[in-house]
Amino acid sequence: MSKELSPKYNPAEVEAGRYQTWLDQDVFKPSGDAEAKPYSIVIPPPNVTGKLHLGHAWDTTLQDIIIRQKRMQGFDTLWLPGMDHAGIATQAKVEERLREQGISRYDLGREKFLDKVWEWKDEYAATIKSQWGKMGLSVDYSRERFTLDEGLSKAVRKVFVDLYNRGWIYRGEFIINWDPAARTALSDIEVIHKDVEGAFYHMNYMLEDGSRALEVATTRPETMFGDVAVAVNPEDPRYKDLIGQNVILPIINKPIPIVADEHADPEFGTGVVKITPAHDPNDFAVGQRHNLPQVNVMNDDGTMNELADEFNGMDRFEARKAVVAKLESLGNLVKIEKMTHSVGHSERTGVVVEPRLSTQWFVKMDQLAKNAIANQDTEDKVEFYPPRFNDTFMSWMENVHDWVISRQLWWGHQIPAWYNVNGEMYVGEDAPEGDGWTQDEDVLDTWFSSALWPFSTMGWPDTEAADFKRYFPTSTLVTGYDIIFFWVSRMIFQSLEFTGRQPFSNVLIHGLIRDEEGRKMSKSLGNGIDPMDVIEKYGADALRWFLSNGSAPGQDVRFSYEKMDASWNFINKIWNISRYILMNNEGLTLDQARENVEKVVNSQVGNVTDRWILHNLNETVGKVTENFDKFEFGVAGHILYNFIWEEFANWYVELTKEVLYSDNEDEKVVTRSVLLYTLDQILRLLHPIMPFVTEEIFGQYAEGSIVLASYPQVNATFENQTAHKGVESLKDLIRSVRNSRAEVNVAPSKPITILVKTSDSELESFFKDNSNYIKRFTNPETLEISSAITAPELAMTSIITGAEIFLPLADLLNVEEELARLEKELAKWQKELNMVGKKLSNERFVANAKPEVVQKEKDKQTDYQTKYDATIARIEEMKKINND
């Protein structure tokens, strides 16, 4: 057990050194219990490009909540950590750092440049691990992986070679998305389309015989030097007689043919289309059909090459302006038509992507996608939370294109293909024997290796590896909806292809962290929040509580410091409650408390408030567990908050003072037992969300770590509807008197007369038996509880279930104001009656809802009607008094 709780909650003091203690105790490693059911999560590996942001904090907090709860529930848990090499992103960061020193990667060469990238990786991996520690993540570092580990690299090579041998990987020359800044190919989903201001440039291409001109339009006039034809529709009567003739390409005066192709739409524009096979995917297809040459007029950095004549060496956008000016001077520019259009931008560098003819490696997706789609109709399907994201996944799989997987980078998994001077190619896991072979210089798309993460980290391709046999498939993946296409989909089809199993049973999809105004956090807006700054001010537990309490599967969360203040205040409340309980504990042990609580629920000792709080605790355990199982952490948090703050702190702890300040030592022991037991259960329920503060408080009264403590379970013996109903009525009575006092500004310290009228004999007896609580909380001069009470003429009236409460305040009561208050009360009951009546008149609800749910609504209707009628009666009485 640790030192006594300090008078004030100080998160920095509570959290300091705690994480290292957990690591030293090895509490995050799997239990190794062969009888326990395995539960595994692989962390979505963060990129080693920099520090973690608030989105990472949210993502990992949700995972930690899940794994900590499962660990406490007795599962053999593994949360496997690791990081992603993030090819293009990391290489860009390192190149940026080198540029600041006046160095390029080409100055260093591949080997020395990669040394620099590894240095970067080591630096930022250490930073990320430090951040994980401050967040309190219960990962097993003995199994930490990196996507460029030798083990994972072996898996990558095997998958590539096997897919190649199965015909699912091929190499070819096609139009791809090209990033001129990173000088690499991009897959379709690495391209972000943005609406930008642009223009259609209309140009005249003169027939070779000079008899007429054909008007064509393009948004990219700088590519005209790659034009190899113009196309017209074969059924277009305007141009039928021109098919087979030539037009002259302006500026360079090159003749190109007029071809007939259905790609040309007679209804669009002039019906004439320039064909540039090396710079447009549609034109590439036309070129293939007509056996046209492919003329590339750009360098890999987005500058024009020597085929662009006088524009050689110019940036593509500068060349665009210059080409248009030249066309105008030659009389070939017809008009410029301004418009807004969608233009692809690189997700990583932000530059405009260039469609470019290039030799690349591709994954053939049709069969792999079909397998993934078919799996969703089996028992082995992946469950999405919320379910709507299954539709997102299926839609993408049904419309997927072949995946370009080669990248013109140095940082990454080098493609396991070799070429020799004879033009031969060898694909294998190991280099070919003999001399004269050169390995393909390209590397694989980062997502290619990430797609293998759930099984490659477990030891695959060794299917006999202990972790692979024990923890794969994994249990749950937690990730954002923004990478369903990039990552989730690819993990599913790769896992099915190579293991025959789904990679995970469940996918919990969360949204994005936004600022208070609902804007996405970004560098350009300057609204990003460093989670470490938040932790420094509020502590990790407060941040984790905010992130979990605001969570609903699939929904975004708005960050605000006001909410962080509320989170800190809640933990401070827990701290103060704990101090009160432990200061009054008098050496009571948890085992002794459990024994006494068992006697309480069996009605051998204790009072009704003890049984009430234990009943409510039991209900809370059930509801929290149920919502955790559905990943509804926000709902679970709301339930916990209400129980801890409202029911336990505001009511039960206050009610116990009636006993703790008395001279009855036997009752004190029972009350202390219920307090300690309930606190212990609360801390266990909270621990997955607030690991640091719960460990600190737990250490005051228990041995060992709360990390390995058992999670609360529903106990049927705790259920006590009689105690629940009675104390809820008691609370309603006390609350009603307090509210009435406040309405007429009668100080709580001033004694008043309280009359409680009830025709319910059981309720009357209950109120009388527990009148000590009523007196303690309402300070009456006189308290009368009876069915024979006659309502005083001038009295504040309130109606609770089963009783009417009158406060004779003749000298203070304004009849007009009391009437207004009662009218407002009447409107409230009318609204409640309308709502429940509407629900009960819905035949579908009555037919389909559970009988107990329908009965609950009927009970509400009866209760509201009673309150409505009583309020009507009281209004009539007050009107009569007013008229008199």
Curated annotation (Swiss-Prot):
Binding positions (ATP): 523
BP-aspect Gene Ontology terms: valyl-tRNA aminoacylation
Signal peptide from the UniProt entry: none
Main location: cytoplasm
Entry's EC annotation: 6.1.1.9
Reactions catalysed according to its record: tRNA(Val) + L-valine + ATP = L-valyl-tRNA(Val) + AMP + diphosphate
Record carries keyword Cytoplasm: yes
InterPro entries: aa-tRNA-synth_I_CS (IPR001412), aa-tRNA-synth_Ia (IPR002300), Anticodon_Ia_Val (IPR033705), M/V/L/I-tRNA-synth_anticd-bd (IPR013155), Rossmann-like_a/b/a_fold (IPR014729), tRNA-bd_arm (IPR010978), tRNAsynth_Ia_anticodon-bd (IPR009080), Val-tRNA_synth_C_sf (IPR037118)
Stated name of the protein: Valine--tRNA ligase
Organism: Streptococcus agalactiae serotype Ia (strain ATCC 27591 / A909 / CDC SS700)
Lineage: Bacteria, Bacillati, Bacillota, Bacilli, Lactobacillales
Gene designation per UniProt: valS
